[in-house]
């Protein structure tokens, strides 16, 4: 009986040891999403903004073809993954119920290597995201028609 209890405790403790990395991995995908796509209060939304943000966010080696920055409150973006600000959309995606202010940066020129030059398109759009554990982890670019 004591040996069985000891084995149970060992398995239980090992299970606890495995839980935090899983949660940390989920949060890291969300943090990566924010790094690539979130800028709460942009300073200008022109070509220079795109070139600066793409460089600062590490998206220019090689030059990323297209990237969208979402502006505003991150809680509203998170809410797309629930019923508060999101609806199901196609396969395993969610679409926002309300539009977001966004800046889409499109690569100009043919070279994928720096210096990267971008053209900015600013506007308001509903956004489509993939969610894991109620957090956005991927922005579906196909919804945007700059």
From Swiss-Prot:
Its main location: secreted. GO terms for biological process: actin filament polymerization; angiogenesis; antibacterial humoral response; antimicrobial humoral immune response mediated by antimicrobial peptide; defense response to Gram-positive bacterium; hematopoietic stem cell proliferation; innate immune response; negative regulation of apoptotic process. It holds the Pfam family RnaseA. The keyword DNA damage does not apply. Its EC number is 3.1.27.-. Gene3D superfamilies: Ribonuclease A-like domain. One of its GO terms (molecular function) is tRNA-specific ribonuclease activity. SMART domains: RNAse_Pc. It comes from the Eukaryota. Disulfide bonds join 50-105, 63-116, 81-131. GO terms for cellular component: angiogenin-PRI complex; basement membrane; cytoplasm; cytoplasmic stress granule; endocytic vesicle; extracellular space; nucleolus; nucleus. SUPFAM superfamilies: RNase A-like (SSF54076). Residues 1-24 form the signal peptide. The keyword Disulfide bond applies. Has weak tRNA ribonuclease activity by itself due to partial autoinhibition by its C-terminus, which folds into a short alpha-helix that partially occludes the substrate-binding site. In absence of stress, the ribonuclease activity is inhibited by RNH1 in the cytoplasm. In response to stress, dissociates from RNH1 in the cytoplasm and associates with cytoplasmic ribosomes with vacant A-sites: ribosomes directly activate the tRNA ribonuclease activity of ANG by refolding the C-terminal alpha-helix. In response to stress, the angiogenic activity of ANG is inhibited by RNH1 in the nucleus. Homodimer. Interacts with RNH1; inhibiting ANG ribonuclease activity. Interacts with PCNA. Belongs to the pancreatic ribonuclease family. This is Angiogenin. The gene is ANG.
């Amino acid at each position: 009986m004591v040996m069985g209890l000891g084995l149970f405790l060992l398995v239980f403790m090992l299970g606890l040891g495995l839980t935090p990395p899983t949660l940390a991995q989920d949060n890291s995908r969300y943090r990566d999403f924010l790094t690539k796509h979130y800028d709460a209060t942009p300073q200008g939304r022109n070509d220079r903004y795109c070139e600066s943000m793409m460089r600062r966010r590490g998206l220019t080696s090689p030059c990323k073809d297209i990237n969208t920055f979402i502006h505003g409150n991150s809680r509203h973006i998170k809410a797309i993954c629930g019923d508060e600000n999101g609806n199901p959309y196609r396969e395993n995606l969610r679409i926002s119920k309300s539009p977001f202010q966004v800046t889409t940066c499109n690569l100009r020129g043919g070279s994928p290597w720096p210096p990267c030059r971008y053209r900015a398109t600013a506007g308001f759009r509903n956004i489509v995201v993939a969610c894991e554990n109620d957090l956005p982890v991927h922005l579906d670019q196909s919804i945007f028609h700059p």
